[in-house]
From Swiss-Prot:
GO terms for cellular component: axonemal B tubule inner sheath; axonemal microtubule; sperm flagellum. This is Cilia- and flagella- associated protein 210. The lineage of its organism: Eukaryota, Metazoa, Chordata, Craniata, Vertebrata. Microtubule inner protein (MIP) part of the dynein-decorated doublet microtubules (DMTs) in cilia axoneme, which is required for motile cilia beating. It is found in: Cytoplasm, Cytoskeleton, Cilium axoneme; Cytoplasm, Cytoskeleton, Flagellum axoneme. Residues 216-238 are annotated as: Disordered.
């Protein structure tokens, strides 16, 4: 068998054919060179042998689409590579349509760049010219705005007054030298002086009313700012109280949720314990039923044993009767043997043999029947016990699976609760962080607003100081220019240069734009000193002042 298995053909022949004698000799080398293609314990009669050409045809048929697709991809790749090489070769040619088009585009691009450069130069020159115009306009506007300020206007009024006074004194001197006792001229001059004094007084009162109105407006604005600050503080306090209330409500809600979760957990635990208790009760009932079934089985087996014992006793009785009958027949036959002839002895022996064979047959059938019944009972008992064991095992598996499912559900429930708690803690932390950030942001905004207000005040003070310096420089130049001609009429200019309404000599009010009151004060608080006038002046200088045209 081993020799025939070694001589089996592997390719191109049916199972059972042998190779040539020259190939059979090298069986060991074949085993080394050609490893077995079939698994062990395979019936070679059930194996289909395919010729090499057919196998190759099948492989070609299966791989045809792949080869065709590979060929198509290779052709497309070769065409694409050739196209790219062609494009690379003719890329810099100038005698092609594409080359000429490229040259035209480059020339057009160059012309556009030159035109754009010229336009940029023109735009730059235009921008420089416009910037100069804007700068000049801004300087003119600043100068006009400077001339339109109240102090400059007052200074110009004082300048005009000094020039008027200078001109008036010149005219007075001229008239005095020409007509010294012209009462009509004096009356007219007096009227003019009174009229001028009234006009100046009205202007001064008007300026004073305007300044009072401006001061009231400033006080009103200060009061509005203070009220706005009070409202803002109240709003912030209200926001803080609202945040505290929201936090308290959130904590109450979280406590309620925790209480609800605890109640749900207690309820779930109670249901689980009830379920386990019911399960134990069911298990006890099932165990009781199992015990009842086992008791029934034991009773059945006991009854079956009793029946078997009764059958054995009956069989023993039957055997005893048969032995007794056999003995009786034997005695009867022995008596007949004494009486009959030899042929009769043969007939009797044959009958005895037949009777014994029949009895043995009946006994054998009976034994087989008893054995079959016992075997059936044993098989039934084994099946019942096996079913019971399988049911018990299945019940234990189901109980274990149910317990695992309950434990898994409990674990999932706790994980879910833990996740919900983490999520709630995270939300609470986020809300708390948001509140903290909002409070910090409000503080930062308030601090920024205060800093901005301080910066604004500093910038305002710096601007006021710069404007004051500019005004003082301008006034000094004008006063020096006017003092070159005469020093007699520069007092209105000096008075207009002084700070405060009316050129007061009181303390400087920084919060009121550097105003100086016209009354005497004790300190920088600006409290006016009491005024005591025990007696009036002995001589009234107002008449002389009005006659001379003074307005202060």
């Amino acid at each position: 068998m081993d020799t025939s298995s070694e001589m089996l053909v592997r390719f191109g022949r049916r199972c059972g054919r042998a190779k040539e004698s020259t190939e059979i000799r090298n069986s060991e080398e074949d085993q080394v060179l050609y490893l077995p293609l079939l698994p062990s314990k395979v019936d070679l009669q059930q194996v289909t042998i395919i010729p090499h050409d057919e196998w190759k045809r099948i492989q070609d048929s299966l791989d045809r689409l792949t080869r065709e697709a590979a060929c198509l991809r290779a052709e497309r790749k070769a065409k694409k590579e050739m196209h790219l090489r062609s494009q690379e070769v003719v890329k810099h040619w100038t005698n092609t349509y594409a080359g000429m088009k490229e040259q035209k585009l480059e020339a057009k691009k160059k012309r556009d760049e030159e035109i754009e450069a010229e336009r940029q130069i023109l735009d730059l020159e235009e921008e420089i010219y416009k910037q100069g115009k804007r700068k000049k306009a801004i300087e003119n506007a600043k100068q006009y705005q400077f001339y339109q300020t109240e102090r400059v206007k007052n200074f110009h009024s004082g300048l005009l007054l000094s020039r008027v006074m200078k001109e008036r004194d010149a005219q007075i001197e001229f008239r005095k030298s020409k007509i010294k006792s012209d009462k009509k001229w004096e009356e007219q001059l007096k009227l003019n002086i009174e009229k001028a004094f009234k006009e100046e007084q009205e202007k001064a009162e008007k300026r004073h009313r305007e300044r009072v109105a401006l001061a009231k407006d400033h006080l009103k604005q200060i009061k509005e700012h203070e009220e706005e600050e009070e409202r803002r503080k109240k709003y912030e306090e209200k926001d803080a109280e609202e945040i505290k209330r929201q936090n308290a409500l959130y904590e109450i809600e979280m406590r309620k949720k925790l209480e609800k979760k605890r109640e749900e957990m207690h309820e779930s635990r109670r249901r689980f314990l009830e379920h386990m208790q019911d399960k134990h009760i069911i298990k006890a009932v099932e165990q009781q039923q199992q015990e009842e079934e086992d008791e029934k089985m034991r009773k059945f087996i006991k009854a079956k044993k009793r029946l078997i014992q009764m059958g054995k006793e009956k069989e023993a009785e039957t055997h005893r009767l048969m032995e007794k009958r056999r003995e009786r027949i034997h005695n009867f036959l022995s008596e007949l043997l004494k009486e009959k002839l030899d042929n009769e002895d043969m007939i009797i022996a044959r009958d005895i043999a037949e009777a014994e064979a029949e009895w043995e047959k009946r006994e054998r059938e009976k034994d087989e029947k008893n054995k079959a019944e016992l075997k059936t009972i044993a098989e039934y008992r084994a099946i019942v016990m096996k079913n019971k064991e399988e049911e018990e095992r299945q019940r234990k598996i189901e109980a274990k699976e149910q317990l695992l499912a309950v434990m898994k559900a409990d674990q999932i429930f706790w994980e879910h609760e833990k996740e919900k708690k983490c999520k709630a803690d995270k939300e609470h932390q986020e809300v708390q962080d948001a509140h903290i950030q909002q409070m910090a942001k409000n503080k930062f905004n308030a601090k920024q607003a205060k800093q901005a207000e301080l910066d604004y005040c500093r910038l305002t003070e710096a601007l006021v100081a710069e404007k004051e310096k500019e005004f003082q420089d301008y006034a000094r130049e004008v006063i020096e220019l006017e003092s070159e001609t005469t020093n007699k009429y520069i007092y209105p200019l000096v008075k207009a240069v002084q700070e405060g309404p009316g050129g007061g000599r009181g303390p400087v009010f920084v919060d009121r734009g550097g105003l100086r009151p016209s009354y005497q004060a004790n300190d920088v608080t600006g409290v006016q000193l009491p005024f005591y006038n025990s007696q009036g002046p002995k001589y009234n200088f107002q008449k002389s002042k009005r006659r001379l045209g003074f307005t202060w």
